[in-house]
Amino acid sequence: MTRNNADKFSIRKFSFGGLLLTALLLTAVTVALSADDRKVETIDATAMGTSTQLGKVVSVKVTIYEYSEEEDRQILMEAFTKGQNEGLVNALTKMKSVGRIAITGTIGYDLSFIRLVPTPTGRKIRFVTNRLLRFGEAYYNTQTTAFNLTAGEIDINDSDKDKSGGVLYPAAQLVINKEGQLEFQLNQNAWKLVNIIDWNKAGTLK
């Protein structure tokens, strides 16, 4: 096993003015659904337009057991304030699983935090979790181990299903830049999620 392949990556930076993790962690306007109100929900999507997977069909499956509560959001906010990205990762590691994400070619891993946000046309489902590191990354302690978050957003449009979409950040870290703003650093392009299939009308009372 060589180290070269594991070390080949480029850092991409995204200012966090209105992007999903800021909204995910800072907004308190969400819909609360108890476990008694809903059953397990499944959303399927196809990832497109990525630098590493361009030309391939990459399927993404998000399974939702329950939605995170306001208390969970506060825990993550405090953890990031105290320990920044590593504090956030450690807090996510200690949380119970509220869902699961599986990508083509992987066995999938647990989601630690899922938020439901109502929109005029439907709802957005936002999630973040600590990323499962590959053996080569951990063994060689490559630079990619710093990108230890996976986050995403699925925007469900009930009025026009063709307008449903989303984004997935497979490997990222949350930092504070020189201007004091939250910034998302990625070691590969964000994945655009299309062909959204909302099997159970996720986030609605049935």
Which role fits each region the language model picked out?
Residues 11, 21-22, 156:
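Intrinsically disordered, low-complexity, compositionally biased regions/tails
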Residues 30-35:
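Sec/Tat signal peptide C-region and signal peptidase I cleavage site
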Residues 17-29:
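Bacterial N-terminal signal peptides
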